Regions:
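Short periplasmic/luminal acceptor-recognition loop of GT-C membrane glycosyltransferases, typified by
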Residues: 57, 317-323, 329-383, 391-414, ...
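Membrane-interface alpha helices of multi-pass inner-membrane proteins
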Residues: 146-161, 166-172, 191, 258-268
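Hydrophobic alpha-helical membrane-interfacial segments at the cytosolic entry of transmembrane helices
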Residues: 12-19, 178-201, 237-238, 297-308
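Membrane-interface transmembrane helices that cradle and orient dolichyl/undecaprenyl
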Residues: 128, 132-148, 240-251, 289
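Extracytoplasmic catalytic/substrate-binding loops of multi-pass membrane glycan-assembly enzymes
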Residues: 26-40, 53-68, 334
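Loop-to-helix entry region of an early transmembrane alpha helix in multi-pass inner-membrane enzymes
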Residues: 56, 60, 64, 72-89
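Aromatic- and kink-enriched transmembrane "portal" helix at the membrane-lumen/periplasm boundary
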Residues: 63, 76, 106-130, 158, ...
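Transmembrane-helix motifs of polytopic, lipid-linked glycan transferases
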Residues: 81-102, 242-246
Length: 450
């Protein structure tokens, strides 16, 4: 085992600091579903039960793990600190696999274009999917404990049941050559699965979990399929390279992990999911690339130049504002003004409010208001289990004496990548009375039925 000396301590300490600033400042505009992922853990920290109190379409490993970082405070700063810690661990395994080539990999990860590689650094289940897969690849390359690999495969399945479940199939590679390895992995796999089963059983959320995470998949893939031509071409090119690698090196199990990991791009073949695939793709390519020169200094300079250039190019007309639980939030000045106007109006009216905006914006408002997360806050196709659209329409139809805030831009949005349930907005517009318009926000009042 590598001795963890003074220089290593400084190196990983600096990586931790950089990762925190990258999350909080450098790449914040690439945050994607940050508020939703944070919101899952925030809700657990608030004492809510996943699948019962709010909808969640992944198994609970990632939200529960990240909620541990919120043990002492619900602030997003602690969420960033927790992710910076995980990214530091991630970098440790990258160094173990790539040695000096790790710095080249970090330069690739810091790039915000042409694929937004930096977006995969943000906390959430997709990052954990990548992180756990990297650890397993390291263990495979070094013939480490099959029990440990099995436990991590179980955690992968509990992180994202679709991709994680497929990654477990890589162990079939050993089925005929060494079936005892497979049995050990199955034994390890069952440990986290059993713990999760007991958690769901005792929290009375087992059926809801099955409905949302498995039966809802039929709606999700059918309703949400979308591809961007540029990223589809990028993915196809990389996939052809992968197939060539498998043909040339059929005994390299890392190729099969990458092949199965490629399923992460479905059903949304766009910048984020293709970048997630590329994060593992470039790691495996670099592992086979012969390069012994020390490029750490040049790489560090390049990473810092990229980071600061990105900051100066993207942060024009933006402000830093501190909301409750969402300190150091960076938004365009116009958006901050809209938020303040909406808050003032709703506070003056003093009515129950449901935000039926994009999921990330619903979570933003709920978290900054220190409110509980509900089933209305992630109104996307495939997020409500079997016949999910009918379920959420039924919930909306039963509302009374409440303000519902919707986004006018979603009403006529023809963007095929948009997962928002427009049938829900149609019902709100039909049933409610428009009482106020604040920029893009439309506020409807749904009265008490006689």
């Amino acid at each position: 085992m590598e001795k963890f000396n003074y220089k290593s301590l400084i190196k990983y300490g600096l990586i931790f600091i950089y990762c925190f600033f990258a999350l909080a400042f450098f790449y914040t505009v690439l945050r994607g579903d940050l508020y939703v992922n944070y919101g899952f853990s925030y809700a657990i920290r608030m004492g809510e039960v996943p699948y019962v109190d709010f909808n969640l379409v992944i198994l609970p490993f990632a939200p529960v793990l990240y909620s541990l970082f919120l043990m002492f405070s619900k602030s997003i700063i602690f969420y960033y600190l927790g992710q910076a810690f995980l990214l530091t661990l991630f970098s440790y395994f990258i160094f173990k696999i790539l040695k000096n080539k790790a710095w080249i990999y970090f330069v690739i990860l810091s790039l915000p274009f042409p694929t937004t590689m930096a977006s995969v650094l943000f906390p959430g289940y997709n990052f954990l999917l990548l992180f756990l897969t990297v650890i397993i690849i390291y263990l495979e390359k070094n013939n480490k404990s099959d029990y440990l690999i099995g436990i991590l495969l179980g955690c992968l399945f509990l992180t994202k049941q679709t991709v994680g479940g497929l990654l477990c199939l890589a162990s079939i590679y050993y089925l005929f050559s060494d079936y005892k390895k497979v049995l050990k992995r199955v034994a390890g796999f069952l440990i986290p699965i059993l713990i999760c089963f007991l958690y769901l059983l005792f929290s009375h959320s087992l059926y809801n979990c099955f409905d949302l995470c498995f039966l809802g998949l039929f709606d999700f893939g059918h309703s949400n399929f979308y591809y961007d031509k540029f990223y589809l071409i990028c993915f196809i090119f990389a996939f052809v390279v992968l197939v060539y690698r498998i043909i040339k090196r059929p005994k390299d199990i890392t190729n099969y992990y990458l092949l199965l990991f490629s399923s992460c791009v479905y059903p949304l073949i766009e910048h984020y999911h293709v970048s997630l695939f590329f994060a593992l793709f470039f790691l495996i390519l670099l592992a086979d690339f012969n390069f012994s020169k020390d490029v750490s200094k040049h790489s560090l300079i390049l990473i810092l130049v990229i980071s600061f250039a990105w900051v100066f190019s993207e942060f024009k007309n933006t402000k830093i504002v501190n909301y409750c639980n969402l300190e150091l939030s960076i938004f365009p000045a116009r958006y901050i003004e809209s938020v303040e106007k909406l808050d003032r109006y709703l506070e003056k009216e003093n009515k129950n409010v449901i935000y039926f905006l994009r999921g990330s914006e619903n979570y933003f408002y709920k978290i900054k208001n220190d409110s509980f997360i509900t089933y209305f806050d992630l109104p996307n196709y495939g997020n409500y289990g079997y016949n999910g659209t009918k379920k959420i329409i039924s919930k909306l139809d039963n509302l009374s004496d409440v303000f519902v805030v919707v986004d006018e831009s979603l009403k006529n949005d023809s963007n095929k990548a948009q997962q928002y349930i427009k049938e829900g907005m149609d019902l709100i517009v039909k049933k409610g009375k428009l009482v106020k318009k604040i920029n893009n926000y439309l506020i409807y009042y749904i009265g008490v039925e006689e």
